[in-house]
Each structure stands twice: as structure tokens, then as C-alpha cells.
Amino acid sequence: MDSQKSCIAVYPGTFDPLTNGHVSLVRRAAMIFGTVIVAVAGDSHKTPLFTLDERVAIAEQVFANDRRVLVEGFKGLLVNYVKSREANVILRGMRAVSDFEFEFQMALMNRKLDRTIETVFIMTDYKWLYISSTIVKEVAKHGGDIRGMVPEHVRERMLERFGPANGSGEGA
């Protein structure tokens, strides 16, 4: 068990925004691995709501009191970043069977690029199965209430971005 506790896991994602599903997965993983690095991706085919620096700052605020969790931004190939951090696990969350095909392909490619790095899948807590960053952004953009889907300070940042009638449920 001691070897598991010294294991460093990297949880990559755009986290735009960071949801309660992400937070739950990181906290559960931190009970398994010695350290979890929340690796906020700067290179993405997505157009982010928040800049890389903003997303890193948001995640740092959420995990500020958990010494087992580090937050860093990164750009480039994930496997190279994982190696640079001397980590040996890529952590991925699974919400539903629909996530599996893409995640399986990515895990196989990462394995091809570096056979010393393992991908570990953790099932999302059932409370968060329906939540994704994309859905949260759409709900907030159209004035829906996102309370309980994201940490409160994330909701506040989204209100700043979309306006007071959005993300609070007050304008819906």
C-alpha cells in the first residue's frame, strides 16, 4: 500500500468550468494516490470561457486546503507533461458508457507513446453523472440555475462572465 501512496496521478482536462463532478473525482482519487495533479490543459480544440490562467486560479482556490492536490497549467502532449512531473498515472473520470470509446482510444495512444504510464479510470459519483462543463456553460448562458453543479466561487465567476441574469436562476 505504501507504493500506491507514493504514486502521482495526473488528472488532465480543460476544466472550463471546473464542476462538482471534477471536484468529487479529485478528492476521491486523492484518497487512493499520494498526490493528484489537476493538469489544466492550455492547448485545446475547444474555445474556452476562461483563460488558462483563470482556470488554474479557479482550481487552485477549490483545492487550496488539500495538500495532496496540486494544480498546474500545461500545454503540449499529455504524456510529456506526465513524465516531466515524474508521475506514472493518468487519471480519467467515466460518466457513462458513451465516454468509454474516446477515453479508451486516448488511453491506448498514451500507452503507445509511453508504456510506463498507466491510465486509471474512476467512475463518476452517481450524483454528478448528468453534469459536464459544456452543459453547465449552456445552462448558465441561457439564464439557468447552476447552483449545486459547480463550486460557489465558480458560479460567481460565471455570473461575472455571462451577466447577473445568467447562472443564478434569477433570470430564468
Curated annotation (Swiss-Prot):
Chief subcellular location equals: cytoplasm
Q: Name one GO molecular function term.
A: pantetheine-phosphate adenylyltransferase activity
Q: Where does ATP bind?
A: 14-15, 22, 93-95, 103, 128-134
User: Which of the seven top EC classes does this enzyme belong to?
Assistant: transferase
Q: In which pathway does it act?
A: Cofactor biosynthesis; coenzyme A biosynthesis; CoA from (R)-pantothenate: step 4/5
Q: Name one Pfam family in it.
A: CTP_transf_like
Q: Which domain of life is it from?
A: Bacteria
Site Transition state stabilizer — annotated at 22
Q: State whether keyword Transmembrane applies.
A: no
Q: State the EC number(s).
A: 2.7.7.3
Binding residues annotated for substrate, in chain numbering: 14, 46, 78, 92
Cofactor dependence is on: Mg(2+)
Its biological purpose is as follows: Reversibly transfers an adenylyl group from ATP to 4'-phosphopantetheine, yielding dephospho-CoA (dPCoA) and pyrophosphate.
Subunit structure, as described in the record: Homohexamer.
Family label: Belongs to the bacterial CoaD family.
Q: What is this protein called in UniProt?
A: Phosphopantetheine adenylyltransferase
Q: What is the species of this protein?
A: Solidesulfovibrio magneticus (strain ATCC 700980 / DSM 13731 / RS-1)
